[in-house]
Amino acid sequence: MPKPIGRRVLFSGYAKLPTGITATELYRVIGLVILVDMETETILEADCTLATQVARKHVAETLIGQSLKNGPEPLVRLIDQVYQGSAKKAIITALRICFDKYRSFKEGALPAMLD
């Protein structure tokens, strides 16, 4: 049976990419999107706008299944360990923005646009 859609929420974060890398020529900023199960506080899906499929897949696979219960730092440390590309700082910044949005939503600080 599929999970009820209401417990899954999508969060996005954006950060400026460094100059001199392909992703900057394509996008200027990195977009990172995570789909979170709000009951388990676990990342179900992740995607980002890096230039290569390998990098996008690696970042996604690294984040999927990770918990948000302990704040952003465990995820930041994980990315810092497993991603040694030039966009690391931008990925981490975008990840922290995603977490800030998640925390605000969880605390009820982000009202729906229809309210």
What spans do the regions from the language model cover?
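Short, compositionally biased leader-like segments
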Residues: M1-Y14
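Active-site- and interface-proximal helix/loop "cap" or "latch" segments in soluble metabolic
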Residues: K16-V33, M38-D115
